[in-house]
Design a protein with these regions (language model features):
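Hydrophobic alpha-helix immediately C-terminal to the catalytic Tyr-X-X-X-Lys motif of short-chain
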Residues: 119-127, 157, 161, 218
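Alpha-helical substrate-binding/gating segment
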Residues: 143, 159-172, 181-206, 212
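Ser/Thr-centric signal marking residues that sit
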Residues: 78, 97-99, 116, 172, ...
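N-terminal Rossmann-like NAD(P)+-binding domain of SDR-like oxidoreductases, especially those catalyzing
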Residues: 1-143, 187, 193, 197
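Substrate-binding strand-loop-helix patch
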Residues: 73, 147-155, 177-190, 204-220
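Short hydrophobic segments within beta-strands
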Residues: 15, 95, 174, 207-208
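Hydrophobic residues at beta-strand termini and immediately following loops
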Residues: 33, 138, 173-174, 207
Length: 220
C-alpha cells in the first residue's frame, strides 16, 4: 500500500481482517476496509483494476492446530476473491508459497498451510484457463523487514531473534539449527510485486535471493 499510494494516479484500498495485521501500520492516503475475504462481495462494491491477494494464513507448523483458519482464510476466502475477480474482470496477483517446491515437490502436502497454498495456485491457473482470468502468481522466501510480527506464535524468525536480543534473552533455535533458508527484505518484495502487477502474467514469479543461510548463522 505504501508504495502504491505514492503514485497519485492510484486509488488504494486495503481489505484486512487484522488476524495478524495491525492498525498501527496504516498508511495515509489508503482507504482501509475491515473484514475478511470470504465477505468480499458484501464489503467491496466497486471493480478494482488490480487485486494483490496477500492476506492468507501464512504459517507452516502452526497450521496443524489452526486448520479451521487455514480452510476459512485460504480456501473459502480465496475462492471468493477469484469469483470477485472473475465477475469484475480484475487482474489478480496472488502470493503463492515456496513450500510447494520443497523436497522435490513433495513439500506441497506436508502441512495444511502448504497444501492450501499449492492447491490454490492450481485453482488460479484453472480459472485462467476456464474463465480467461488475468493473473500472476508470485513466490516469497522468508520475508523480513518493517512490519514483521515479533511476538507470539506467529512471530517471524528474524523479528523473533531481534526481539529476544533487545530483551537480552537467549535466541530460540530449533534443533539442529543447520536448516537452510533464503531470506528476502520486504523492500525487494514490494519492488517485485509492483513489476509483476504491471507486467506479470501467469505462474512462476519467484522474488528472493539465491543465497541461503542456516538458522544458526542468522542467530550468530
Amino acid at each position: 500500500c505504501e508504495a502504491l499510494v505514492k503514485d497519485p494516479k492510484n486509488q488504494v484500498y486495503s481489505l484486512d481482517n487484522y488476524f495478524t495485521g495491525s492498525r498501527e501500520n496504516h498508511i495515509e492516503g489508503v482507504t482501509y476496509i475491515e473484514g475478511s475475504t470470504e465477505h468480499i462481495f458484501e464489503l467491496i462494491d466497486f471493480a478494482p483494476d488490480l487485486i494483490y491477494h496477500l492476506g492468507e494464513y501464512s504459517r507452516v507448523e502452526q497450521s496443524f492446530e489452526d486448520i479451521d483458519k487455514v480452510l476459512l482464510f485460504n480456501k473459502i476466502g480465496t475462492l471468493k476473491v477469484l469469483e470477485f475477480c472473475r465477475k469484475h474482470h480484475c487482474k489478480l496477483v496472488y502470493a503463492g508459497s515456496s513450500t510447494k517446491f520443497g523436497d522435490g515437490g513433495l513439500g506441497k502436502d506436508q502441512s495444511p498451510y502448504a497444501w492450501s497454498k499449492s492447491s490454490n495456485t492450481e485453482l488460479i491457473i484453472n480459472y485462467g484457463n476456464w474463465y480467461d482470468l488475468k493473473y500472476a502468481i508470485v513466490y516469497f522466501y522468508n520475508v523480513y523487514g518493517k512490519g514483521e510480527i515479533s511476538i507470539g506464535k506467529y512471530a517471524t524468525l528474524i523479528a523473533l531473534f531481534t526481539e529476544q536480543m533487545k530483551k537480552g534473552e537467549p535466541l530460540t533455535v530449533v534443533s539442529p539449527g543447520t536448516q537452510e533458508r533464503n531470506f528476502t527484505h520486504i523492500d525487494d518484495i514490494v519492488s517485485g510485486l509492483l513489476i509483476v502487477g504491471e507486467k506479470g502474467n501467469g505462474d512462476g514469479y519467484g522474488i528472493g535471493s539465491p543465497e541461503t543461510y542456516t538458522v544458526l548463522h542468522i542467530a550468530q
